[in-house]
Amino acid sequence: MNNFRATILFWAVAAWVTSGKPLGEMDEVGVQKCKNALKLPVLEVLPGGGWDNLRNVDMGRVMELTYSNCRTTEDGQYIIPDEIFTIPQKQSNLEMNSEILESWANYQSSTSYSINTELSLFSKVNGKFSTEFQRMKTLQLKDQAITTRVQVRNLIYTVKINPALELNWSFRKELLDISDRLENNQTRMATYLAELLVLNYGTHVITSVDAGAALIQEDHIRASFLQDSQSSRSAVTASAGLAFQNTVNFKFEENYTSQNVLTKSYLSNRTNSRVQSIGGVPFYPGITLQAWQQGITNHLVAIDRSGLPLHFFINPNMLPDLPGPLVKKVSKTVETAVKRYYTFNTYPGCTDLNSPNFNFQANTDDGSCEGKMTNFSFGGVYQECTQLSGNRDVLLCQKLEQKNPLTGDFSCPSGYSPVRLLSQIHEEGYNHLECHRKCTLLVFCKTVCEDVFQVAKAEFRAFWCVASSQVPENSGLLFGGLFSSKSINPMTNAQSCPAGYFPLSLFENLKVCVSQDYELGSRFAVPFGGFFSCTVGNPLVDPAISRDLGVPSLKKCPGGFSQHLALISDGCQVSYCVKSGLFTGGSLPPARLPPFTRPPLMSQAATNTVIVTNSENARSWIKDSQTHQWRLGEPIELRRAMNDIHGDGGGLSGGAAAGVTLGVTTILAVVITLAIYGTRKFKKKAYQAIEERQSLVPGTAATGDTTYQEQGQSPA
């Protein structure tokens, strides 16, 4: 009997472990099972993963892939997941081409061309933060060169995803966390989690992959070679092709003298060259094209990708356990997070290399190449602060307030007008000892103290001063750059101000370097063109129109000025403008990665949503109070839930019921106290009555005692 029980327990535990194992682990078991059974390699070039379309980087897996059926490609060469299908090329598709890329603006990726060219609001910056793009742009501008690219591409399979597949367990869990925050009205935390989702899974989902290999040579040759050469563009591409053939041994039997003459001038003007073997065997000098092709079979990689935006896959079909309206809110929140990622990595500026206003860091042209710079006077900055909550010992405004050195107060000097740049709430957590009296039955009381965590809040309002009329020369402040805790001052290449300048504090951690010394400070002075933020434009763009018509200012820089990031303050981008050509040297900046929103120090009060109704199809979802899972509600359940929320008219509301309960408890306590007091009083009165009666008849008691004694002695 004991053996039977042990067997049952063993299989129960085994079943629980199997059912409780994450899908990712189940997938690994399936892969190994198929490899052992079929003795075939697994196709590693698979769609269904996340993709960062700014950096051209593969991200976390979005779609779930399983190997329960041990499927293979049509040619039986590779094991593939159940959720994908392949389109094999019946014959080897070997392609060789040469091209000239005169400008970085029309550069196309070798391995992600299709997904980079998808049309969207921010498609102009797709791939602009990839390693290959930044390398090419830097070399073109540094060497004043153009780029030639020769490549041999061998396509083996096109791998596509099945539209009916499911979301990966980890990705789905993060979506459920976002939905839980949204349904409980914790919007700020939901935004923060959505930005973390973009950080982990990218901006798109790969739906199709071209599997194969590519051998690529990129040369950078002086731009003057193409301009001064009597040869045509086709002759230059032919020279690039011949240079590639010299690198990769094509084993041509004939070698013409004209080929040597044609390539000699090309090679003498080459400033940089790189050969990449993407897939196949590693490249080495002298490798033959035949040897490289023969090594492709077991070394397939993705040589092109197609995909759709991440939020496209957040729909009711993918999340059937959630109410449709809630799924739409999750999708919109993720879409907004992706757009914010694109926005904070868009660098407007002049992209014309021949313009004096050229901005090396700009990745989108804003039409500023033709503008002429105007000298503007800078009236300083200041910041006001109001404490909203917190202990007396937690004074937030002491480090948030900043007076204008030109006035010594929170104001602008004469002839200048204040521009409110941004208003935000600053939060800081603190602990303090909180004591209160705790009583039982209103009689037994004691003092209870506990360490309580609370959040102090203060509102700060940042202003800068713009000239509203003609001001005297040298009346404002000199601008010497700025820096924050996460950025350096381009004037000093450090988190500091130039000599003769002092910092003014703005926002929570921005330092603006200014000087009032026009003799010593002019050496490091930078022509300043104003501030603007996500909420307020720059009045210097067209001051006459803004002042006369009262229309909102444009969020851009005046002509002759270039835009630069000051900081991202809790999801809001603040930019400043300096003379074009300054602060644009050095290397290209890396991508600014999310999250950009600061998570709340304490969770907001939850609204505990229990019913979601879809107005489009009149369907309602109810959240189970025990399992916290959503399900479609029946009419009877809906009426019962509505009665629980709003009351049925015959009962008491939650507050009324609490009041009645408290009242009854108090009355009972009073009654019990009075009863105890009355009982004690009654007993005391009874004792007093007996004593009085005894004092009135003392003789009776004495006679009785004597008689008793006599009776006791008479027999003697």
Curated annotation (Swiss-Prot):
Keyword Disulfide bond recorded: yes
List the glycosylation sites: N168, N185, N269, N375
Query: What S-S linkages are listed for this chain?
Result: C34-C70, C350-C369, C385-C397, C435-C449, C439-C445, C534-C572, C557-C577
Composition bias (Polar residues) maps to 703-716
Q: Reproduce the UniProt comment on modification after translation.
A: Proteolytically processed in two steps to generate the Macrophage-expressed gene 1 protein, processed form: cleaved by trypsin in proximity of the helical transmembrane domain releases the ectodomain into the lysosomal lumen to orient the pore-forming domain toward the endogenous membranes, and processed by the asparagine endopeptidase (LGMN). Proteolytic processing in antigen-containing vesicles is pH-dependent. Monoubiquitinated in response to bacterial infection; ubiquitination is required for vesicular localization and antibacterial activity and can be blocked by bacterial cell cycle inhibiting factor (cif).
Membrane topology of this protein:
Multi-pass membrane protein
Source species, domain of life: Eukaryota
| Region spans: P2 | 413-656
One Pfam family it belongs to: MACPF
What are its GO biological-process terms?
A: adaptive immune response; antibacterial innate immune response; antigen processing and presentation of exogenous peptide antigen; antigen processing and presentation of exogenous peptide antigen via MHC class I; defense response to bacterium; defense response to Gram-negative bacterium; defense response to Gram-positive bacterium; dendritic cell antigen processing and presentation
Which positions fall inside the MACPF domain?
A: 30-345
Task: Give the matching SMART domains.
Answer: MACPF
Q: Does the keyword Nuclease apply?
A: no
Question: What does the UniProt entry say about where the protein is found?
Answer: Cytoplasmic vesicle membrane
* Site residues (Cleavage), renumbered to this chain: D352, L353, N357, F358, N359, F360, R631, L632
The regions listed as transmembrane in this protein's record are 113-120, 127-132, 235-244, 248-256, 656-676
Give any GO molecular function from the UniProt entry.
Answer: wide pore channel activity
Q: Which InterPro entries match?
A: MACPF, MPEG1
The stretch of residues making up the signal peptide is 1-20
Instruction: Give the record's free-text account of how this protein's activity is regulated.
Output: Forms arc- and ring-shaped pre-pores on top of the membrane at neutral to slightly acidic pH conditions and converts to pores upon acidification. Undergoes transition from the pre-pore to the pore in a processive clockwise hand-over-hand process. In the pore state, 2 alpha-helical regions refold into transmembrane hairpins (TMH1 and TMH2) in each protomer that form in the ensemble complex giant beta-barrel transmembrane pores.
**Domain remarks in the Swiss-Prot or TrEMBL record:** The MACPF domain includes the central machinery of pore formation: acidification causes a significant structural rearrangement, leading to oligomerization and deployment of the transmembrane beta-strands (named TMH1 and TMH2) that enter the membrane as amphipathic beta-hairpins.
Q: What does this protein do?
A: Pore-forming protein involved in both innate and adaptive immunity. Plays a central role in antigen cross-presentation in dendritic cells by forming a pore in antigen-containing compartments, thereby promoting delivery of antigens for cross-presentation. Also involved in innate immune response following bacterial infection; shows antibacterial activity against a wide spectrum of Gram-positive, Gram-negative and acid-fast bacteria.
| Subunit relationships | Homooligomer; predominantly forms a homooligomeric arc-shaped pore complex instead of complete rings of 16 subunits.
What family name appears in the similarity comment? Belongs to the MPEG1 family.
- The protein's name in its UniProt record: Macrophage-expressed gene 1 protein
Query: Where is the organism placed in the taxonomic lineage, from the top?
Result: Eukaryota, Metazoa, Chordata, Craniata, Vertebrata
